[in-house]
């Protein structure tokens, strides 16, 4: 028995440990929809869209702006703004501590990034929510960064695009966060008065005070495939109305069928299609889009588990 342990079992365990340690962390990713094991470099080439089932995975705000805007000429707006715990709010944890943890986790100061730049050579300003930062919740800094982006559009006579991904208003800022709904809506009214386009792109998920304000105020409202969009969550609605909701309720396809949004665009098509749309809205020549050359990647065998 002892010889079997020494000769067979222990070497087997050691080989298993070596195999596990030889796989770099983050090299493989499991699709949350079809559970396919995907090679991270290959997934980056598809803009974090599963090549097996077309599931659009959540991506960070900075990554989203980097793949949407042209490489040259980007400038971040409102980067100097930092959140302040004016109310000294505390639930199960101090708001100040929640901010510190979110900043450490994401590397961002708050849940919205705004940048000026170009889209296919056309001047634009774009904002994107960082859902990993406290659920992309909207507080004072999110509202102010959004307003600064809109003011940039007003000053430079350029269109604005916003990628929404949020659970709603930030409860730790109470009325201050609710005020951002009116603040962002007011500046969008100014854009409309000046005839400057605002395109809202709804990504997974968009809920609460963000869906009840800026996210649904676009001149054109676009959504990514199968994004969850609503005000209250489906479970809350079912408990309130005491009825089973339809299949796919609050998915972008359901909203498109019922006239709540204008179109659904896959992530890889956002640059050319929004570029063409904005050029028409601004009465500019149709921009030329050159699709990037995607070089083939040698995908190693996937591990049994990740």
Curated annotation (Swiss-Prot):
The protein's name in its UniProt record: Acetyl-coenzyme A carboxylase carboxyl transferase subunit beta
Top-level taxon: Bacteria
Subcellular location: Cytoplasm
Family per record: Belongs to the AccD/PCCB family.
GO biological process: fatty acid biosynthetic process; malonyl-CoA biosynthetic process
Function: Component of the acetyl coenzyme A carboxylase (ACC) complex. Biotin carboxylase (BC) catalyzes the carboxylation of biotin on its carrier protein (BCCP) and then the CO(2) group is transferred by the transcarboxylase to acetyl-CoA to form malonyl-CoA.
Coarse class of the protein's main subcellular location: cytoplasm
Pathway stated in the Swiss-Prot or TrEMBL entry: Lipid metabolism; malonyl-CoA biosynthesis; malonyl-CoA from acetyl-CoA: step 1/1
Residues annotated as transmembrane: none
Name of the top EC class for this enzyme: transferase
GO MF annotations, alphabetized: acetyl-CoA carboxylase activity; ATP binding; carboxyl- or carbamoyltransferase activity; zinc ion binding
Keywords per UniProt: ATP-binding, Cytoplasm, Fatty acid biosynthesis, Fatty acid metabolism, Lipid biosynthesis, Lipid metabolism, Metal-binding, Nucleotide-binding, Transferase, Zinc, Zinc-finger
Gene3D superfamilies: 2-enoyl-CoA Hydratase, Chain A, domain 1
PROSITE patterns for the chain: COA_CT_NTER
Cofactor(s) required for function per UniProt: Zn(2+)
InterPro entries: AcCoA_carboxyl_beta, Acetyl_CoA_COase_Trfase_b_su, ClpP/crotonase-like_dom_sf, COA_CT_N, Znf-ACC
Free-text comment on the cofactor: Binds 1 zinc ion per subunit.
All copies of domain CoA carboxyltransferase N-terminal, residue ranges: 27-296
Binding-site positions, Zn(2+): 31, 34, 50, 53
EC number: 2.1.3.15
PANTHER family according to UniProt: ACETYL-COENZYME A CARBOXYLASE CARBOXYL TRANSFERASE SUBUNIT BETA, CHLOROPLASTIC (PTHR42995:SF5)
Zinc finger C4-type: from-to: 31-53
Reactions accelerated catalytically: N(6)-carboxybiotinyl-L-lysyl-[protein] + acetyl-CoA = N(6)-biotinyl-L-lysyl-[protein] + malonyl-CoA
NCBIfam families in alphabetical order: accD
């Amino acid at each position: 028995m002892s010889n079997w342990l020494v000769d067979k079992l222990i070497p087997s365990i050691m080989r298993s440990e070596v195999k596990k340690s030889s796989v770099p962390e983050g090299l493989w990713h499991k699709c949350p929809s079809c559970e396919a094991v995907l090679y991270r470099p290959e997934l980056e080439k598809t803009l974090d869209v599963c090549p097996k089932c077309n599931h659009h995975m959540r991506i960070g705000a900075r990554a989203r702006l980097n793949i949407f805007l042209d490489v040259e000429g980007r400038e971040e707006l409102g980067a100097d703004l930092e959140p302040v715990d004016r109310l000294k709010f505390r639930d199960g944890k101090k708001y100040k501590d929640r901010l510190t943890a979110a900043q450490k986790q994401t590397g961002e100061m708050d849940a919205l990034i705004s940048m000026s730049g170009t889209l296919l050579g056309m001047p634009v300003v774009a904002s994107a929510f960082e859902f990993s930062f406290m659920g992309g919740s909207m507080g004072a800094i999110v509202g102010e960064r959004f307003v600064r982006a809109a003011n940039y559009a007003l000053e430079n006579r350029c269109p604005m695009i916003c990628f929404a991904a949020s659970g709603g208003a930030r409860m730790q800022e109470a009325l201050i966060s609710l005020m951002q709904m009116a603040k962002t809506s007011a500046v969008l009214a100014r854009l409309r008065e000046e005839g400057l386009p605002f395109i809202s792109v709804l990504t997974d998920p968009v809920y609460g005070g963000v869906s009840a304000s800026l996210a649904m105020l676009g001149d054109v409202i676009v959504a990514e495939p199968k994004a969850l969009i609503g005000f209250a969550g489906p479970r809350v609605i079912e408990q309130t109305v005491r009825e089973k909701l339809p299949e796919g309720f609050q998915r972008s396809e359901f909203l498109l069928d019922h006239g709540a949004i204008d179109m659904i665009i896959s992530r890889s098509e956002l640059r050319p299609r929004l570029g063409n749309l904005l050029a028409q809205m601004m009465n500019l020549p149709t921009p030329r889009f050159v699709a990037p050359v995607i070089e083939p990647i040698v995908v190693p065998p996937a591990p049994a588990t990740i």
